Design a protein with these regions (language model features):
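Extended, histidine- and acidic-residue-enriched regions that form the cofactor-binding/catalytic faces
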Residues: 1-97, 101-288
């Protein structure tokens, strides 16, 4: 295997509750699927390259607090990915791509931060492809492309519902109907729409979106659109082009989302207090 001509794919996503109708492994299953598809597409488009598919890593942060959700601290996820990326780089691999099915802001930034760290320190290309893509998807950027691939285009009301589909709803239920139909509860068809709104009260049903709208056809259409985007980023990267605009999300520079923000904030406060105490002692000494 020529490591200069090998793309490594890391599927990384947590185990998390997605409502009463879906399995705990929704994000993890999605990550495995997209990593496999990305690897397959890479060797098709670039027969001069090999693809190495790393075992799935069922770890993530900032999860909904539901039975079965398993999270770690942001620093743990960050350190783990930095460690794996560094090890792969030391073994000579130059191209590493993370695929994730989890779209929480802190998770995205932790993965991106780890990739930036390894890329700069080891002079390789390591990218989280899914983060920026997830944000664009949630903003509704791909709705028209998906609609055009369906046997019956989406109506305006359906497009509006899709823009509010965040967790365990239309898209994720559709993906499980495609990937793991035996793990989808029949009751999804009778679940009411649940819109995520700030300040809303009441019992959380475990999902935000419209699971009753789900279909395997919708999943297939969305997969085609997303894989095209993933393939484009990988192709650019393997061709030596800068893909940071495609792989660094708009939320990357938000300090409060950084994986070790609280630790650094506390250290900063302690250093400030220590400095003030020293200045006070110096002042007291000088005025004597």
């Amino acid at each position: 295997m020529d490591k200069d001509k090998t793309a490594v794919f890391l599927p990384v996503s947590p185990i998390e509750g997605h409502g009463p109708h879906l399995p705990l492994g929704v994000d993890y299953f999605d990550a495995l699927f997209f990593a496999d598809k990305a690897a397959e597409l890479t060797v098709q488009k670039r027969p001069d390259f090999d693809a190495l598919l790393y075992p799935g890593i069922p770890v993530g942060i900032q999860l909904y607090k539901q039975p079965g959700s398993l999270r770690v601290e942001g620093g743990v996820l960050y350190d783990m990915i930095v460690g794996l990326g560094t090890s792969l780089a030391l073994w000579g691999f130059k191209y590493i791509f993370i695929l994730s099915g989890h779209g929480s802001p802190k998770d995205i930034v932790a993965l991106e931060s780890a990739c930036v760290k390894v890329s700069k320190k080891r002079k390789i290309q390591m990218h989280n492809i899914s983060g920026s893509l997830a944000i664009r998807f949630l903003k509704g950027e791909f709705i028209e492309k998906i609609s055009n691939r369906l046997s019956e285009p989406l109506k305006e009301r359906e497009k509006e519902l899709l823009r509010k589909d965040i967790h365990g709803g239309w898209w994720e239920t559709s993906m499980m109907l495609k990937l793991k139909p035996d793990l989808v509860g029949d009751g999804y068809k009778s679940l009411q729409d649940n819109e995520k709104e700030r300040g809303s009260s009441g019992t959380f049903p475990g999902y935000f979106g419209s699971p009753a709208m789900a279909s395997a056809e919708f999943a297939e259409a969305s997969v085609e659109v997303l894989i095209d985007e993933v393939g484009s980023v990988i192709e650019k990267c393997l061709s030596g082009k800068d893909v940071s605009r495609e792989t660094i999300s708009p939320i990357y520079n938000m300090l409060i989302l950084k994986p070790k923000f609280r630790r650094h904030l506390l250290m900063g406060i302690l250093i400030t207090i220590k400095s003030l105490v020293i200045l006070w002692l110096i002042y007291r000494f000088l005025i004597r």
